[in-house]
Amino acid sequence: MEAEKRLFLKALKEKFEEDPKEKYTKFYTYGGWEQSVRKREFVAANEKVLAEKRQGVPLYNPDIGVPLGQRKLMPYKLSGTDSYCEGDDLHFMNNAAIQQLWDDIRRTVVVGMDTAHSVLEKRLGVEVTPETINEYMHTINHALSGGAVVQEHMVEVHPSLAWDSYARIFTGDDELAAELDSRFLIDINKLFPAEQAEALKKAIGKKTYQVSRVPSLVGRVCDGGTISRWSAMQIGMSFITAYKLCAGEAATADFSYASKHADVIQMGNALPGRRARGPNEPGGIQFGILSDVVQTTRVSDDPVEQSLEVVAAGAALYDQIWLGAYMSGGVGFTQYATAAYTDDILDDFSYYALDYVEKKYGRMGTKATMDVVEDIASEVTLYSLEQYDEYPALLEDHFGGSQRAAVAAAASGIGVCMATGNSNAGVNGWYLSQILHKEYHSRLGFYGYDLQDQCGASNSLAIRNDESAPLELRGPNYPNYAMNVGHQGEYAGIAQAAHSARGDAFAMSALIKVAFADPMLVFDFSKPRKEFARGALREFDAAGERDVILPAK
């Protein structure tokens, strides 16, 4: 790639005063933490909070610990956008869009309607028609947000606290879809390109599914395991109301079983007891599921962009929220994640990989063999590492070895997928890149960063099914993946890359792909990086706020 075309140069020139190739810089000349607009805001806010709420107990003090600002406190460019922000604005606690990304995933549950309809028709002799389905959908939209049905004298939830809660329906049956109230329909034909729509409808068949969006506030106050229970309770009550059933009817137990267990698709699997987490929590969300949650394949034909948007969503969800908070209990994982979705660095490496593949093999132009994995991963890894050698500013941007290891390996895996359409080959490209990188620099990042990479290739081809699961079926709790930051979001992007190369309508689940195409969602899953930028710039309007029940100010 010609030097002037390198995608990361614009960001480097904006971030640093020196030429990106300059080998020398200054220290302790930037004004310490006061060089940062956000740090100055934090200090001012701290003084106000101390005066009004802390009873003299200290809070924020940037002069404690390692002195901030001896180096440039650099801004970040959100990759694929023209937006710049400070690093603090990408911490999930400071970014409403990243919070909403997780809220919108956690508060979702997909429920099959056919079992309940079968109970109505076969056990109770009640006819199910498009008209009765529409009536039920009207009822569930009242109940799901906290409205009372069946019983009187019941307390209800203020609509302003639950405006983001609703239920919609989708089906692969065009005739039925045409008769349903369009307000409740997730219309596959309108939301997806024609070829994708046909593939999705074929996968779904004549079945009908409800997508429940529980209020964001419920997930925050309770947990992901609450979501299906909240949904199931309101589904049962809404069936009783819409179909005028007796609440004590024995068949209602079947509604309960279907909506809580038999016909429920959670976003995340329940985790082992030692993780202390139920379903619909980040550690149980498989990489293929996250690939289908992200919707870039609907709006862009660029396979690299499709893959990188999944990487960004995964970096925020898995690295920042799951590993950075749930698992470690700290605040320090943000910049592991941002390395993968800022400053167009991974973009540059990945487009180099695609260019190399298209010239040598053609997209989807070769079989998945170790020779192909070795060729592409070696080429892309060496290109990536050479950029760090040539541009010291790039090295300063990715100041941690594990940041560099993650993006070089991710681009290698994406490149292998572009050539083969095979996610297992792609993840082996990642593993090879890590090993090459370690040979190049003697180490990668913190001790143990490369634990999974040393055994990954043999695991991916193992006989034991817990180790050899296809990449799409793996997740944060897969053996050896549990506590190594700077991997999981990239794995999800590699899984997507294989399906992007193939032109598939979905990676793992047609149901998830359709459910998250819903334009009523608060977070736009077709452009996660743009949404993160809006959150960083404080332009994102999130759900789940409590202003209506707080004192007026």
From Swiss-Prot:
UniProt keyword terms in alphabetical order: Cytoplasm, Metal-binding, Methanogenesis, Methylation, Nickel, Transferase
Organism, as annotated: Methanococcus vannielii
Catalytic activity: coenzyme B + methyl-coenzyme M = methane + coenzyme M-coenzyme B heterodisulfide
Binding site for coenzyme F430: Q151
Pathway listed: One-carbon metabolism; methyl-coenzyme M reduction; methane from methyl-coenzyme M: step 1/1
Binding-site residues, coenzyme M: Y336, Y447
Assembly with partners or alone: MCR is a hexamer of two alpha, two beta, and two gamma chains, forming a dimer of heterotrimers.
GO process terms (BP): methanogenesis
Chain sites annotated for binding coenzyme B: R229, K260, H261, R274
Protein name, entry field: Methyl-coenzyme M reductase subunit alpha
Disulfide topology: none
